[in-house]
């Protein structure tokens, strides 16, 4: 299986036949010694594992061939860190490697076997310091990657060291600037003396100001005045104003005449409407106000007038109809038997009954009127005419 990893032929392998060449050089800077027999094996691994014939020097020494085969098996295709390439004469090896089995070279010659075992002894001495047991820590930091200033700060806690506070661009008083935005106890505004405010501010000298004084100073550039300005007097009581015409000081509105002099509301309106100054006899001490009528009374009167007109309109129609019926009934009732004056009040009373809502026709009693038996046709014609007129009046209503 590992025959392809055989050592390649090298012109300098004959120089390593002597056991003296396996000794560690006193002035070498490498911590361990690598046998020259491994260098060709590593070169053959890096060259693509090409098969090559075994040289006659290694064929005569079966111990070296078995050692090279055992060493090459440690660097298989699945190894994550293949060895670096070195020249054939190099003596440096970058990492520690476990020694091979002691029985691998048992069949070799005495001189070759003792030389290989002697070469393994220096390697065993340097293998222990290079290996780091599990659970241990490094004794010192890496000076090539970590500067001395930062390495000293790593020994402290995550927030207690000088790294956090030594960063550039950070002010050491950022905590006080942050806390000044919150209301604190024992503070007093240097301008107005306020002890409580939603937001404490500072002026240019660092003194505390309340929110109102701080905003006033920020917007206007001066201190906030402590005395409140007096309220503006009303127009009716402005100091120093007097009407030029009537010399009054009480008015609801100050006006100006054509010359620009102040006048009261009454004198100004009189001059505007009439074109002449207001007479002094019309001056009043009290201000006259308008007597406005409430809107509810006007609405109530308007609604009552409309209801009256609506109720009067049906009666007018009924009266016209009744007058027409009376004018037609009077000539028919006039006869030589019945006197006229006695018939007129009766007809008017019947007309009033016909206007009532429950009576739709005229009723005549036979004992009130004496009609001859020889003339029944006029009475029958009168009743038919009265019924027709009553129906017409009902239809019109």
UniProtKB/Swiss-Prot annotation:
Changing residue 240 to D: In CHTD5; decreased transcriptional activity. CDD domains: ZnF_GATA. Its main location: nucleus. It is found in: Nucleus. InterPro entries: GATA_N, TF_GATA_4/5/6, Transcription_factor_GATA, Znf_GATA, Znf_NHR/GATA. Changing residue 200 to G: In CHTD5; decreased transcriptional activity. Residues 102-112 have a biased composition (Gly residues). It is linked to Congenital heart defects, multiple types, 5: A disorder characterized by congenital developmental abnormalities involving structures of the heart. Common defects include transposition of the great arteries, aortic stenosis, atrial septal defect, ventricular septal defect, pulmonic stenosis, patent ductus arteriosus, and tetralogy of Fallot. Some patients also have cardiac arrhythmias, which may be due to the anatomic defect itself or to surgical interventions. CHTD5 inheritance can be autosomal dominant or recessive. This is Transcription factor GATA-5. The gene is GATA5.
